[in-house]
């Protein structure tokens, strides 16, 4: 048995012993979905993966856009209310408390990723967390008020890593 399997089995036993009947995992990489499925977990949030294709011409920037090339706790902290507000609008998601949010952003920076934000009149209107992988950049989360924020975030992330394919996830439309 591998170390990861043993660790997960010990964690599941500990949860059972404590009477915890429900647990979640958020796979950091795509290959983990299959691994966790083999351990009895199922996918409950169905994201669609899209490849960003830049427009033939650059869309003029009408928003203020900010990023940092190294983890900046103040930058991340100031964006948490926007992140929290936008995530709470979703029908299905895991709501991260502030400390988990900071850990997620900091971990992205440890993987050479970056947090990006758009603003209108100094008010956040878009948020993206992008992490480079071997031959692509994955936008782990993309939140925006309008299509303009979405476009400007993706355009700037692509320009930052121009030699890599840019992929991002979207939630499926909820009917009813």
Protein language model features and the residues they cover:
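Conserved GNAT acetyl-CoA-binding A-motif
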Residues: 8, 15-28, 161-172
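Residue-level detector of functional hotspots within protein domains
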Residues: 9-11, 27, 87, 102
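Small-side-chain structural scaffolding
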Residues: 1, 11, 23, 27-28, ...
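Conserved acetyl-CoA-binding loop-helix of GNAT-fold acetyltransferases
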Residues: 1-13, 38, 147-158
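Conserved active-site alpha-helix within GNAT-family acetyltransferase domains
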Residues: 17-22, 28-47, 173-176
């Amino acid at each position: 048995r591998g170390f990861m399997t043993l660790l997960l089995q010990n964690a599941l036993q500990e949860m059972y012993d404590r009477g915890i009947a429900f647990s979640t995992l958020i796979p950091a990489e795509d290959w983990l979905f299959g691994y966790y499925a083999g351990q009895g977990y199922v996918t409950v949030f169905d994201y669609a993966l899209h490849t960003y294709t830049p427009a033939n011409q650059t869309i003029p920037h009408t928003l203020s856009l900010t990023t940092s090339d190294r983890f900046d706790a103040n930058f991340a902290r100031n964006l948490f209310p926007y992140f929290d507000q936008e995530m709470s609008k979703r029908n299905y998601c895991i709501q991260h408390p502030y400390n988990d949010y900071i850990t997620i952003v900091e971990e992205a920076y440890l993987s050479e990723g970056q947090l990006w934000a758009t603003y209108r009149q100094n008010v956040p209107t878009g948020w993206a967390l992008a992490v480079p992988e071997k031959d692509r950049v994955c936008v782990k989360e993309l939140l925006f008020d309008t299509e303009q924020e979405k476009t400007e975030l993706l355009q700037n992330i692509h320009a930052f890593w121009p030699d890599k394919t840019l992929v991002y996830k979207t939630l499926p439309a909820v009917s009813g």
